């Protein structure tokens, strides 16, 4: 591996002590008898602002939190609600009343015509406390059924890297591919691109970020990759 692609930090294994300046962030970093310890495999890296070191988990499952905007996949249809895959161990619920924004009338409203299995939605997590299914809403600007574009799935742990500091990586992706990109907290990304070639380039670039998220020089490699692909495809 070249120095350009070396990990920008040190691998930490579960149970390993961490420096005192690392913030405890359960369940990934715990304070056990006065010593900070990792509970998952992660990376110990220098903070960009020179403020010491931080622990970054390398693998993560998505645990919903109220206020998160997620991209969900309709998994099944109930009597008065839909069950939604949100890329998490927890299956979410969206009520038909919420989707319609009014009371449901079974004599008039056909749930299958509103949302069917396999449809994607952009929704907000309203409530979740691990004792019941996450509750979703599509009432809000930009929320609802996704009717066009492509969905890409990455590790939820890599979401901050796709967005970048001050949205730098996301802006780079949008400027270089001419795609409109929305990154949901649960590791799903919605792309709306001018054509199939630019969409394919954007998907490949995002996959590179997902695979090489914590390597140095990534932004420059992404720019070079996109520019080269556009040259080859003449787009």
UniProtKB/Swiss-Prot annotation:
Keyword RNA-binding: yes
Boundaries of every S1 motif domain copy: 67-139
GO cellular component labels: cytoplasm; exosome (RNase complex)
Residue ranges occupied by any KH domain in the UniProt entry: 149-205
Main location: cytoplasm
Cross-referenced SMART domains: KH, S1
Keywords: Cytoplasm, Exosome, RNA-binding
SUPFAM superfamilies with a match to the protein in the record: Eukaryotic type KH-domain (KH-domain type I), Nucleic acid-binding proteins
Xref: PROSITE patterns: S1
Any one biological process term the GO annotation gives: poly(A)-dependent snoRNA 3'-end processing
Entry keyword RNA-binding: yes
Stretches assigned to coiled coil: none
InterPro entries: Exosome_RNA_bind1/RRP40/RRP4 (IPR026699), KH_dom (IPR004087), KH_dom_type_1 (IPR004088), KH_dom_type_1_sf (IPR036612), NA-bd_OB-fold (IPR012340), Rrp4 (IPR023474), RRP4_S1 (IPR048565), S1_domain (IPR003029)
UniProt subcellular location: Cytoplasm
GO MF, one example: poly(A) binding
Function statement: Non-catalytic component of the exosome, which is a complex involved in RNA degradation. Increases the RNA binding and the efficiency of RNA degradation. Confers strong poly(A) specificity to the exosome.
Listed NCBIfam families: PRK04163.1-1
Subunit organization: Component of the archaeal exosome complex. Forms a trimer of Rrp4 and/or Csl4 subunits. The trimer associates with a hexameric ring-like arrangement composed of 3 Rrp41-Rrp42 heterodimers.
Family of this protein: Belongs to the RRP4 family.
Protein name in UniProt: Exosome complex component Rrp4
Originating organism: Aeropyrum pernix (strain ATCC 700893 / DSM 11879 / JCM 9820 / NBRC 100138 / K1)
Lineage: Archaea, Thermoproteota, Thermoprotei, Desulfurococcales, Desulfurococcaceae
